[in-house]
Swiss-Prot record:
This is GTP cyclohydrolase 1. Belongs to the GTP cyclohydrolase I family. The lineage of its organism: Bacteria, Bacillati, Bacillota, Bacilli, Lactobacillales. Zn(2+) binds at C75, H78, C146. Toroid-shaped homodecamer, composed of two pentamers of five dimers. It catalyses: GTP + H2O = 7,8-dihydroneopterin 3'-triphosphate + formate + H(+). One of its GO terms (biological process) is tetrahydrofolate biosynthetic process. The keyword Thylakoid does not apply. Its EC number is 3.5.4.16. Keywords: GTP-binding, Hydrolase, Metal-binding, Nucleotide-binding, One-carbon metabolism, Zinc. One of its GO terms (cellular component) is cytoplasm. One of its GO terms (molecular function) is GTP cyclohydrolase I activity. PANTHER family: GTP CYCLOHYDROLASE 1, GTP CYCLOHYDROLASE I.
Length: 184
């Protein structure tokens, strides 16, 4: 990540909106924003393979559900945050991931400029590709600051997106069970 370019760009934005980039409260802002971007975009170029490849053998194939995984990310359209909760269900095929690995999977894909629909897809596909799940079902509910603080200005509006892979695509009863276990 080119922090010098980020700092220069932020300084130009400060000046472009009519502020003095050299006043006390803004002098360090370009450097702070560059450090923040290093942190919140740390998922760029990464996948969840390293997290989901560390799995444990299991003899049954009962559904695993982890819900209310908090995340925050940046909308790629306005570079404003959106945040919320991810709910994950999957059917193992002989192996299960450690529970923290599901949260880490959400984190990896949320640490980059993102849209909610793609975040859903990337998490579900990672469970299928790297864990070898028989099925994956991901629901994300989020509030988007681009809707809350600008434009339509409707704070508190939740957007829900879902994606189903494998067994969840074809088995409505399985999806319904996942919804119930997720409390949705």
């Amino acid at each position: 990540m080119d922090t010098q370019k980020i700092e220069a760009a932020v300084k130009m934005i400060i000046e472009a909106v009519g502020e003095d980039a050299n006043r006390e409260g803004l002098q360090e802002t370009p450097a702070r924003v560059a450090r923040m971007y290093q942190e919140i975009f740390s998922g760029l170029g990464q996948t969840a393979e390293e997290h989901l490849s560390k799995s444990f053998e299991i003899i049954d194939d009962n559904m695993v559900v982890e819900k209310d995984i908090f995340f925050h990310t940046m909308c790629e359209h306005h570079f404003l945050p959106f945040y919320g909760r991810a709910h994950i269900a999957y059917i193992p095929d002989g192996r299960v991931a450690g529970l923290s690995k599901l949260a880490r999977t959400v984190e990896v894909y949320s640490k980059k400029p993102q849209i909610q629909e793609r975040l859903n897809i990337e998490v579900a596909d990672a469970l299928m590709d790297y864990l070898g799940a028989k099925g994956a079902f991901v629901i994300i509910e989020a509030e988007h600051m681009c809707m809350s603080m600008r434009g339509v200005r409707k704070p508190g509006t939740a957007t829900l997106t879902t994606v189903a892979r494998g067994l969840f695509e074809t088995d409505k009863d399985l999806r319904d069970q996942a919804y119930r276990l997720m409390g949705l």
